Design a protein with these regions (language model features):
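Redox cofactor-anchoring modules in respiratory/redox and cofactor-processing assemblies
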Residues: 1-116, 125
Length: 126
């Protein structure tokens, strides 16, 4: 087993952080059991959809249900713990997920697809 502690601040996007960890666990899955092999891929697809600005509130609900399914039906510790970053961020930072899908904004300003720039013509000199 292993464990770790990561310190983050308001400049960390919790949705992107969950996506990062799911990317790792998807790559590390041995592929023996379907819940882990396919489930982590589906979770990652949903997270990528949300961080790209194409997610829906239904995707958030689907994430949570799929996390519980993977956790309860995977054969090994990797599959059983793979959903933890998603479940933790949904529990404590659900508002960030909602901001991504409803407001189409990343509160931390991390998700590039959700960044919008505007030129203020009267302040622009050039």
């Amino acid at each position: 087993g292993s464990g770790g502690l990561i310190v983050m601040d308001e400049d960390t996007c919790m949705v992107d952080m969950a996506r990062y960890f799911l990317n790792f666990t998807r790559d590390e899955s041995c592929g023996k059991c379907t819940p882990c092999r396919v489930g982590t891929k589906r979770l990652l697809e949903k997270l990528e959809k949300i961080t790209s600005g194409n997610g829906t509130l239904e995707d958030i609900d689907d994430l949570e249900a799929l996390c519980h399914y993977i956790k309860e039906n995977s054969l090994c510790g990797l599959g059983q713990t793979a959903p933890n970053p998603v479940l933790s961020t949904l529990k404590f930072f659900r508002d960030e997920y909602v901001a991504h899908v409803v407001d189409k904004k990343c509160p931390a300003g991390v998700c590039k697809s959700l960044l919008h720039y505007e030129i203020v013509a009267d302040k622009c000199k050039g």
